[in-house]
Amino acid sequence: MESKDQNVYRKGSDNFSKGSNTFFGNLKSISTTTTTTTTTANTDQQVSKVAENNEIDDNSSVDSSSSNPSSSSTSTTPVKPKTFVDGALRGVWSIGVGVVNGAKGIVEQPYLGAKNNGLGGFVKGVAKGVSGVVILPAVGVLEFFSYTTQGIYNTPITVLDAMKSSPKEEEMITVSAEIPTIFFAVELEESFKTAKEKGIPHLLKVCIEFISRRKNIEGIFRISGSKFLIDEIQSKFDKGLITSVEDLDPNWIYEVACIFKSYFRYLPHSVIPDEQITEFYRIQNNITDATEKAAALKAVVNSIPNFQYTILYECISLLHDISLNSKENLMTPSNLSIVYGPSLLRPNIEKGDIQEIANANTIVFNLISFFQQIFIKNPDPSILEIEHPITPIKPMIQK
């Protein structure tokens, strides 16, 4: 059943279409009226009657050259253009009809005038024929804009009608929603335990290896991938169907990047323990000296339990490597921190605390920018089984 607003909208659409059709029907009748008084009266009567009933046909005008001008014309209620394209096509057709009828009138009207009233009728016929050449194409152009506008106006109604036959929400439940997930919205350690029991690599391992091979792709982590593909890939991950980078299409970089960042966003709890998150915010709010801040961040990072530290290490390491390719991928530490700050530091977004969100982004910015100075402890290779080349630790930044 339609709502009151929908009924009002539909009624407004009907009135707009009928009003436009009546106006243009009357306008076209000016240039197609015959020279005889009787015919003029009949034509005006037809137009008046049809206009009164809002039944002027869009694709026909009252033809004064009919063999029986006194008979009333038959008109049908025009079908409204349903979409912009439909309206535009009708408008183009109307322009063509106007040009043809105008050209026809400049020959036909003088002939009929001369036949009925001699020289005087011929002169009047020429005048009406010329007016038809001007008016009918002009009306066609105006109708083009009218039909197009009607199409735009009626598009929401077309969508509403289509929605009536669409499947209800309960009918669109995907299979993945009925199967217990392995990774998404599952506690971090539990997902690792489940993956190990099933003998499959963790989603993070596959995503990190996949993205690491494509670090120079422009807009990585910023450009959204295909929603359809993201849902499909996520479902396959949660069913244990993706076990290596070979199971992923090389062109799915934006989709896989989206899945990687979404994984951290939808963890029930951040990969960083609450105690360390609190310390991170304290450092950001109280320490302004760059060297002191880096040293304080390093101390907090290295106090994170080994399991969470390894996951955080792998994540920040990947982001750091991507930032080193920012000339190609346009993803600087600042851009990356905006993407990952809220997921890793969990600021109170619902309350709209802008300063807390900014602080979260700044903390992640520092973790990415000074990764090698802050993450001095090696990760546990048995957790994600990702091998890293040994890189020298750079000295702490100096003021």
UniProtKB/Swiss-Prot annotation:
Report the subcellular localization.
Answer: Cytoplasm
Annotated source species:
Dictyostelium discoideum (Social amoeba)
Could you say which residues are annotated as the site Arginine finger? R222
- Residues passing through the membrane, by range: none
Gene Ontology CC terms: cytoplasm; plasma membrane
Q: What is this protein called?
A: Rho GTPase-activating protein gacC
Share an example GO biological-process annotation for this protein: small GTPase-mediated signal transduction
Q: Which UniProt keywords apply?
A: Cytoplasm, GTPase activation
InterPro entries per UniProt: Rho-GAP (IPR050729), Rho_GTPase_activation_prot (IPR008936), RhoGAP_dom (IPR000198)
Name the PANTHER family on file. RHO GTPASE-ACTIVATING PROTEIN GACC-RELATED, RHO/RAC/CDC GTPASE-ACTIVATING PROTEIN
Compositionally biased intervals (Low complexity):
61-79
Q: What ranges does the record give for the region Disordered, renumbered to this chain?
A: 1-80
The answer to keyword Cytoplasm applying to this record is yes
The entry's function note states: Rho GTPase-activating protein involved in the signal transduction pathway.
Domain Rho-GAP stretches? 186-375
Pfam family name, one: RhoGAP
CDD domains (alphabetical) = RhoGAP
Start-end of Basic and acidic residues biased regions: 1-13
UniProt GO molecular function: GTPase activator activity
Which pairs of Cys residues are joined through disulfide bonds in the record?
none
Q: Please tell me whether the keyword Cell membrane is annotated for this protein.
A: no
| Annotated Polar residues bias | 14-31
